Amino acid sequence: MTAAAVLAGHEGPAAAVSVPLLVKRLGRVDYAPAWEAMQHFTASRGEDTADEIWLLEHPPVYTLGQAGRPEHLLRNDAGIPLVKIDRGGQITYHGPGQLVAYLLLDLRRRHLKVRELVALMEQAVIDCLAEYGLHAERKDGAPGVYIDGAKIAALGLRVRNGCSYHGLALNVDADLAPFGWINPCGYEGLQTIRLKDFGVGDDVAAVGERLLQHLLRLLPPGVVPSR
């Protein structure tokens, strides 16, 4: 799928907020065109461009954020691609069975600071997992969502001209072996887990719809600047 195809996507209905928000359910998309599409969307948006949330999966890929160090890739027996990208954070893995939600938002219109958006994304995941009877929590100084100290969701953002892109990744039924070949998010020995480990049978699409409702509930409304 090309970057242009990602941008076309499948648009859902606008959310019931003052600032228009479109939801795109993209299925499985290669990382590079998705990243290119996020950059293009953010660079070309205007004051009245609708915000968007993209729900998708990626084929196996490691991404290395701006704070990442190549030595955190310990081994790569499977030949998984490594892509150096512009989000915050360090190294992580994306692959089938992992829900990815990209939040392309004008933070100024929604009166959101970056740290507030991070906390909002974490809370949306925590509330989503609570629907499955799971108690998840934050960890000071280590963005993401954890259950008993093991990481189930990773976060990373880039903000350009007051607008965010990238977002979060939640392990649903992903193969966790590739996490064992890195120091996830730069932390040696950090355990990663998935919803499947707790008997959750929902697939990525079903979990995505639950998470989406919590994101929409928590996002503050905003106003498109009048002309």
UniProtKB/Swiss-Prot annotation:
Catalysed reactions, semicolon-separated: octanoyl-[ACP] + L-lysyl-[protein] = N(6)-octanoyl-L-lysyl-[protein] + holo-[ACP] + H(+)
A single BP term in Gene Ontology: protein modification process
UniProt lineage: Bacteria, Pseudomonadati, Pseudomonadota, Betaproteobacteria, Rhodocyclales
GO cellular component terms listed in the entry, alphabetical order: cytoplasm
Gene3D superfamilies reported in the protein's UniProt record: Bira Bifunctional Protein, Domain 2
Active-site residue numbers: C185 (acyl-thioester intermediate)
Function text: Catalyzes the transfer of endogenously produced octanoic acid from octanoyl-acyl-carrier-protein onto the lipoyl domains of lipoate-dependent enzymes. Lipoyl-ACP can also act as a substrate although octanoyl-ACP is likely to be the physiological substrate.
Main EC class the enzyme belongs to: transferase
Pfam families: LplA-B_cat
Binding site for substrate: R87, G88, G89, Q90, I91, T92, Y93, H94, A154, L155, G156, G167, L168, A169
Location in the cell: Cytoplasm
HAMAP family documented for this protein: LipB
EC number: 2.3.1.181
Alphabetically ordered keywords of this record: Acyltransferase, Cytoplasm, Transferase
Listed name of the protein: Octanoyltransferase
Protein's pathway: Protein modification; protein lipoylation via endogenous pathway; protein N(6)-(lipoyl)lysine from octanoyl-[acyl-carrier-protein]: step 1/2
Recorded family membership: Belongs to the LipB family.
Other remarks in the entry: In the reaction, the free carboxyl group of octanoic acid is attached via an amide linkage to the epsilon-amino group of a specific lysine residue of lipoyl domains of lipoate-dependent enzymes.
Positions of the record's site feature: Lowers pKa of active site Cys: K151
Organism: Azoarcus sp. (strain BH72)
Record-annotated BPL/LPL catalytic domain positions: 47-223
Chief location category: cytoplasm
Gene Ontology MF terms in the entry: lipoyl(octanoyl) transferase activity
